[in-house]
């Protein structure tokens, strides 16, 4: 059962609040999975500060390893009302990388409170960093990357990789499959709102999966890089997300919230081998947290 919390923080914000505190003060409505979420988040942030790590990629990897074994659960953000959902106990492939971003960004700012984590979640999950209704959520990874790059959260490194290619595609899966989305089934007004933000003839960089075993490509990838799997499914840009872990031999692996594995896990095969079995994933995009 979800617990609702209304935070009235604006009046409590100190006069000389930091940017992080000001962001935290804007959070209005939240939904927690259970009452231990805030405790677990605070414990994770304390571990991050104690680690002494300052590099963003190193922190992403550190926190990903802390979350190994967390159950995979889909649709945790969905409810009758759009609320800022915080669920550290159940993750899907997108909430996993959002969580890694929020933890890492808090630690880089020397913050150790779940409130800072929550502000970072709102910042990365919603267009312009502000939660509104369902349409304010960044549903498509292509817009998610663009919006977060413009606001200084993320940088895409795909264009700088050797052998990069480009694809042009309409990103409009949601409005063509409204029955698959609870909030769109019987709400034509919301469908039209979503349609406004869908991308037409969108050109984006990607690396074909055949290059993932290339020495130059492997040398350009870092542990803690975010990665998305590009799909050939009509109307969709990507179908899965995770992070890269580079082993001692220089081979990149995928660490993800795995639907098939049922938990956050490090995949057993190198990334190029992992993608060989897929009939729909044709390549990858790679991005990092901005310093």
Describe each PLM feature range.
Residues 205-217, 231:
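Short alpha-helix capping/helix-loop boundary micro-motifs
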Residues 9-11:
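C-terminal motif of bacterial Sec signal peptides marking the signal peptidase cleavage site
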Residues 216-220, 236:
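Short, surface-exposed secondary-structure edge patches
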Residues 225-291:
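C-terminal soluble interaction/assembly domains
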Residues 67-204, 222, 246, 250, ...:
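Acidic/His-rich structured neighborhood in mature extracellular/periplasmic domains
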Residues 19-98:
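Cationic-aromatic interfacial patches
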Residues 1-6:
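Sec-dependent signal peptide recognition
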Residues 13-15:
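Bacterial signal peptide processing site
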């Amino acid at each position: 059962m979800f617990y609702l919390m209304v935070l009235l923080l604006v009046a409590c914000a100190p006069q000389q609040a930091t940017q992080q505190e000001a962001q935290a003060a804007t959070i209005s409505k939240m939904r927690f999975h259970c009452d231990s979420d805030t405790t677990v988040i605070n414990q994770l942030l304390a571990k991050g500060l104690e680690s002494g790590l300052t590099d963003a990629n190193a922190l992403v990897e550190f926190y990903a390893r802390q979350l190994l074994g967390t159950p995979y659960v889909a649709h945790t953000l969905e409810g009758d009302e759009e609320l800022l959902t915080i669920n550290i106990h159940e993750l899907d492939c997108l909430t996993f990388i959002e969580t890694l971003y929020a933890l890492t960004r808090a630690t880089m700012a020397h913050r150790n409170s779940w409130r800072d984590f929550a502000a970072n979640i709102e910042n990365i999950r919603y267009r312009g960093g502000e939660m509104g209704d369902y349409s304010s959520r960044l549903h498509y990874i292509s817009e998610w990357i663009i919006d977060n790059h413009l606001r200084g959260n993320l940088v895409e490194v795909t264009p700088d990789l050797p052998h990069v290619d480009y694809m042009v595609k309409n990103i409009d899966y949601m409005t063509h499959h409204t029955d698959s989305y609870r909030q769109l089934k019987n709400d034509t007004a919301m469908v039209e709102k979503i349609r406004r933000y869908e991308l037409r003839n969108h050109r984006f960089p990607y690396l074909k999966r055949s290059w993932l075993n290339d020495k130059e490509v492997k040398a350009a990838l870092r542990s803690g890089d975010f990665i998305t799997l590009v799909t050939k499914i009509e109307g969709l840009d990507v179908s899965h997300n995770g992070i890269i872990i580079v082993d001692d031999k220089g081979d990149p692996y995928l660490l993800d919230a795995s639907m098939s594995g049922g938990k956050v896990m490090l995949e057993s095969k190198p990334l190029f081998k992992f993608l060989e079995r897929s009939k729909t994933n044709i390549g990858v995009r790679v991005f990092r947290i901005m310093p």
